[in-house]
Amino acid sequence: EVNNIMILGGSRIGVRIATELQDEANVKLVEYNPDKAYKLTETLEKTLIISDDGRNIDSMIEEGLSNMDAFVAVTGRSETNILAAMVAKRLGVKKVIAEVENLNFINLAESMGIDTIINKKLITASNIFRFTMNTDVQAIKCLTGCDAEVLEFIAKPNSPATKGQIRELDFPHD
C-alpha cells in the first residue's frame, strides 16, 4: 500500500501525479525553483510543496525520503532523475519511478534497479500504435538510427483512419 509519496520535479508530469494522488495519499513535491514552488502551492492545496535541491542527499533525507512508500523523479534531466531514484532505492523506498527521456540511458537506469522508467516518446508511440492497431492496420515499418523513431502505418481500405482528416479521428486526449 502506498501512503507516502515524494515527487521530485514540478514538471507537468509531477503536477499531474500530485493532483491525482493528493486526495488518497500524503504527497510531497520537491521543486528546485522557488518561484515555481510558490506557484505550485496555489494549485496543489493538499500536497506539501518543498523548495529545495533534490540532488542534495542530506536535504532529501531531512525531508523524509527514507520514510516514503514511493518516489517519482520527473525533473527535466534524465541524469538527475536516475541518480535521485538510485538514492531513494538505497534508502529503502519500495517503489521508485524515474522519467528518462535520454533513450541512451534507459538500459542503464533499468540495470540500476529502478522499478519503473517513464519515457514520453515511447509512451506516445505505444499509445499511437495501440490506437492504430484498433483501426485494422495492414503493415508497419520502423525507421531508427536518429533522435526520432518513425512508424509508417498502411491502413486497410474502409478503416476509420481512411474516412476523414486526422483531426477528426477519435484520438485519446491524454
Feature locations, PLM:
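Cytosolic regulatory regions of ion transport systems
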Residues: 1-174
